[in-house]
């Protein structure tokens, strides 16, 4: 089975000391083949780990069985200079399995060809047979946050130029449209107020009658 291990060593150590810790941890692996070690550098952590803010990153690649990392897990948990370890079994990862599956590879190629064909037609509607120079071609450029915020305002301005601003029509009392709107609004408020008054009178009369019955 193919394994990847990410090892984080205490960042307060020097590079030589971190390499010694890395080599010591590699000796705990058993029955491994093709071990490859890559130093990824000293990086800041997103959050403190064992009160440390930085760590030396190492990546291991090797082939082994289920028992290859058993001793490594035990010693890594005991060693205080090891901040964190991550063991990845590539043969259990769906992405890795799909990358070595011939059927998945063929399906991915078919989807890619279909995608390139659609992009070619959209970019060249007059001549759809022109080959695509880049698979990442797009019909429209991506907009920034500022452009996205400005776009609704531009669309609203186009509507105002074509249809007129409804707010300005309401603000002008000399236009029939405003008078009609204002009259309808006043009638609705009067009807609602009359209904509320009638409801209040009925409730008051009902309570008054109940009080008389009790007497």
Curated annotation (Swiss-Prot):
GO terms for biological process: translation. Residues 144-153, 199-215 have a biased composition (Basic and acidic residues). GO terms for molecular function: rRNA binding; structural constituent of ribosome. Residues 188-198 have a biased composition (Low complexity). GO terms for cellular component: ribonucleoprotein complex; ribosome. CDD domains: bS6 (cd00473). Keywords: Ribonucleoprotein, Ribosomal protein, RNA-binding, rRNA-binding. Binds together with bS18 to 16S ribosomal RNA. Belongs to the bacterial ribosomal protein bS6 family. This is Small ribosomal subunit protein bS6. It comes from Mycoplasma pneumoniae (strain ATCC 29342 / M129 / Subtype 1). The gene is rpsF.
